[in-house]
Amino acid sequence: MHMLIPTAPTAATLSSSTQELLHAREIRKILIKLRYLPLIPVDYLGLHGHIHGSYQWRFKIPRALQTLAASDSWQDPWNPLVLGALYQFEAVHHLPVEPGDMGIRGLPPTIEKALVHAKKNDPDPWTWILVTKFPRPEEIHLFMGGHGWIFQSKANTGVMHATPDGTWPVYARDTHTAMIGRFPIPVPKAQVRLYEAAKSAGYALQSVHYARYHHHWVQYQHYDDPDIRWVNYFDRGRAVHFYPRASYGFPQSAGCVELPKSAAHKIYALIHYGTPVTVSHSAVGPWDPPGSAYLDAPQKSQQLHLTYQEIPSKSSPRSVHLQLVETAVKRPTS
């Protein structure tokens, strides 16, 4: 799984860029305007009467996505949802799919210039993959903005926690590729101790290499799979792809999310570069049923200016009663 793969886009693999033309806030604004990031800027009243900026989704989202969105600040340059929007923008504009030195900050000049001059909206619907480990069976769920949950299938994650929980955007895709790597085979601790004791006693033994993997003793078995289909890389060498198994729904892989053939083919056709992939220990309910009413159009939103206004009828020389007054602010036309 970890050999014949595209280099995962991380800050460590990128050279320093020149003076950036765009700040992270401006990049988010462009991605929102062109619908790569399906949000609407809104304002809200914070402590001490200060107005703060936030975002509202353009469609209804399930509880699990609400929890995910709340777990990362939109201002974080490595926010996986924002980074995924950037990857989709890059793919649509035939640019290298990569982050900057710091997520969406420090982008290469070619990508910044493309953002500045871009006019093409995202041609694909926004999608999100949720992989749940519990309750069993393990499953993959596909959410599409404006349509809700549109697909579900059994899936396999990695043995011995080889598929960590988290969220990453799809950064590379291939309909057909090869994977080479090492698969961890668990061995009993007693077997390791017996081998070490026999070797220390001077017995002539065939050399065996044991290693520690996620708090388990293992032996590694090399694999070379030349025909892996419908591959979506999201976290280094980990990908969502087809792999033939006798059954699905429990950990079996070396770290990837394995799917049955028909499911992998359908997922590949429905998602795109930048689709966030969330691996979760368990689902966050309640789940919205498939076919529930999702919004196809953005929810109406106004930027509000809030001020305090005195209520003379309730005021006196010793006390003043105030109420908040909302005034819609006209957005400048661009």
Where are these regions (language model features)?
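Cell-envelope/ECM-targeting effectors and their regulatory/trafficking segments
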Residues: M1-V187, Q191-L194, G291
